[in-house]
Amino acid sequence: SARLGVTAMAIYRYFKNKAAIEHELVDLVVGDYDVINHNRDDWVEWLYTTYAKMRHALCNHPGVMPLLDNASYQGGNALTVMDRILQELRRAGLSERQAAQLFHTLMAYMVGTVVLMNEEARRAIVVGKSNTNTAVTSRSRKLSFEMVSLSPYPHIAELAPHLAQVDAERQFRESVLQIIKSVAAS
């Protein structure tokens, strides 16, 4: 604020309170990534691409994650995204219940993967790797398993090599497609 020649409180001339700033920040990130403006002939591919773009946006802005609980459905950009997703789900023939369930299930899954990816990115930086490609992430996971004794945890020890090699991008796609298939069949 000093560099701009204003006080730290000057922002409140434009926003009612801290919550209003947070809502606008979340909505700005949602709007900047334009997650729904893409063409896919197949509604399943359209939906996957939309959630993959949301995931990418949140991974690029991890500071927004703590703000999602209060601000995610209140801004115009966020509401536009939600409305368009629901429109596509209904257009695909899903019932109201299925559309609502699929929207929330995919949102919860996507946010959960972002939390894990952000933690892996933070861990990679701590061990001296600034990027988060699959090889770096796998090494980081492997190192985290090697840093603790797994003898009291035989199942983790048995699966550690496989857990370290999970390809997050491929896993995200496969899981989103499986969730869509499961909800659409219910």
Placement of each model-derived feature along the sequence:
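Mid-protein regulatory/catalytic core that forms ligand/cofactor-binding pockets
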Residues: 83-119, 123, 129-130
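C-terminal peripheral helix-coil segments that are non-catalytic and often amphipathic
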Residues: 91, 119-186
